[in-house]
Swiss-Prot record:
GO biological process annotation, one example: proteolysis
Keyword line: Aspartyl protease, Cell membrane, Hydrolase, Membrane, Protease, Transmembrane, Transmembrane helix
Catalytic reactions of this protein: Release of signal peptides from bacterial membrane prolipoproteins. Hydrolyzes -Xaa-Yaa-Zaa-|-(S,diacylglyceryl)Cys-, in which Xaa is hydrophobic (preferably Leu), and Yaa (Ala or Ser) and Zaa (Gly or Ala) have small, neutral side chains
Protein name in the entry: Lipoprotein signal peptidase
EC primary class: hydrolase
Function statement: This protein specifically catalyzes the removal of signal peptides from prolipoproteins.
Tree of life domain: Bacteria
Recorded GO MF terms: aspartic-type endopeptidase activity
InterPro entries linked: Peptidase_A8
Native species: Tropheryma whipplei (strain TW08/27) (Whipple's bacillus)
Pathway: Protein modification; lipoprotein biosynthesis (signal peptide cleavage)
Residue numbers annotated as active site: 116, 132
Length: 150
């Protein structure tokens, strides 16, 4: 395993750890909404059986399967890329954090619910988590990196 690959998986591991710690804290301490910035940002505990930003609610097993496929693809793609590993690590870490929830949170084994807790009126009715932000940053960063390399 190359140093680059080790750094990649160390970053992914750190991102998954950060995601799981924030979800644990939200689950343990958010009994009700906590307003951080009035009319802009609040913490709201929610459980999501859909994808990022509550898209596709009720299809947890499908997003679990797609997440596993994405993790395998990124792992396969990593040694074939010469670009920055940061955006791929953000993508891999975010996907892995939510796949972890689907696997180990009730009702378990691919059907678990993802813990969401970040809420802003900018995205009406959408509650999300740190892993969703990692995925979003990874997708946009990878897209911009690939677009800029042409």
């Amino acid at each position: 395993m190359t140093t680059r690959t080790l750094r990649f998986y160390a970053l992914v591991g750190f991102l998954v750890f950060l995601d799981q710690v924030t979800k644990y804290l939200a689950h343990a301490y958010l009994a009700r909404d906590f307003i951080v910035i009035p009319n802009l940002f609040r913490l709201t505990l929610a459980k999501n059986s859909g994808a990022a930003f509550s898209f596709g609610t009720g299809f947890s097993w499908l997003f679990f399967l797609l997440g596993i496929i994405a993790l395998i693809f990124i792992g396969w793609f990593l040694p074939r890329t010469t670009g920055s590993i940061v955006f791929l690590a953000l993508l891999q870490g975010g996907i892995a954090g939510n796949v972890f929830d689907r696997l180990f949170k009730p009702p378990y084994f691919g059907n678990g619910e993802v813990v969401d807790f970040l809420n802003t009126p900018l995205f009406s009715g959408v509650v999300f988590n740190i892993a969703d932000l990692f995925i979003l940053a990874g997708v946009f960063g990878t897209f911009l990196f690939l677009k800029g390399s042409k």
